[in-house]
Amino acid sequence: MKKEEIRNCLNTLYDAQSLRIATSNRLLQIFSKKFEDDNEKPEISLEKDILSEFEKINTYKDEQSKSIKKSISDLKTNFITSEEEYNQVKAYIFLLESEKTYTKLLQKAVENHPVYINFLTDIKGCGPVMAANIIAYLDPYKARHASAFHKYTGLDVVVSKDKNGEPITDEDGNFKTHGRSRSDTEEYEYTNKNGELAIKKGLTYNPILKSKLIGVLATCIIKAKDPVYSKIYYDYKFRIQNMPKHKDKSKSHQNNMAMRYMIKQLLTNLWVYWRKAENLAVTESYAVAKLNMNPHGFNY
């Protein structure tokens, strides 16, 4: 399946997911109001309390051949106390099933894609939905260097500037940098609705993809103990914990630095594989080509 079709499947899944989450929040709000006057307001669980009660009503209704209204009355349920509420929960379950269907369609589409088959499936912690995000939004034809993948996912660094827009330097005269965020906007070229090149100021990266890679994939890889990338994470984390420049930073800061480094290495390897698979030129990284540094994993 083409990446455009995977992107459409992915967006449809997230639309369904957003509607399901909004509906679940609304249901919890509705059922929580029943206990507003209680001194000890219970913590309501959608799965444990409401959905299990829904199944209980269904089972009783079928076994006793009674109406929904009569079943609710006989069971003296705590949460679902009317046929209207029963139907609202029933509609929510339909949303759950729809989301599962869209997930299966997306998985089927991704599992036939060569990038998933030959690269992403080997990474422990990277499932089909995460793979879909990567395949749908990264383009090896547009990315002439691995750093383009880093920039598009917001994992490049930005030179820090003062209030006058001047670069800030440290005591050694080196530019101070920071991780890219939503406040870091730049002018860039884009194709307008008339098909013409134009310039506008805005984000140069995909914030949603960044949050997926750092907030979800990175932690999944570490928990799954992927033999390649979790090692990169722990090696880099140990390294910065012993560097004078970084050793006094908080543990969470060091953890975030190590996760970003790990994902950047993953994206670099992905870029190399994908460019070769598409018979496109592959270049050395900036650190190797321009700074004469050894590549990651070099045996010193």
Regions found by a protein language model. Give the residues of each.
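Basic, amphipathic alpha-helical segments enriched in Lys/Arg and hydrophobic/aromatic residues
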Residues: 250-287, 295-298
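Conserved aromatic-histidine-acidic binding/catalytic patches
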Residues: 4, 8-11, 15, 90, ...
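Short, hydrophobic/amphipathic alpha-helical patches that form generic packing surfaces
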Residues: 4-25, 29, 132-137, 211-219, ...
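Long, charge-rich intrinsically disordered scaffolds of nucleic-acid metabolism proteins
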Residues: 1-112
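Eukaryote-specific, cytoplasm-facing alpha-helical/coiled-coil scaffolding segments in long proteins
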Residues: 42, 238-245, 288-300
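A glycine-rich phosphate-binding loop feature that marks nucleotide/adenosyl-phosphate handling sites
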Residues: 125, 166-167, 172-175, 286-292
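Phosphate-backbone recognition surface of nucleic-acid-processing proteins
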Residues: 119-120, 134-256, 260, 273
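Coiled-coil termination/hinge junctions
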Residues: 98-131, 135-140
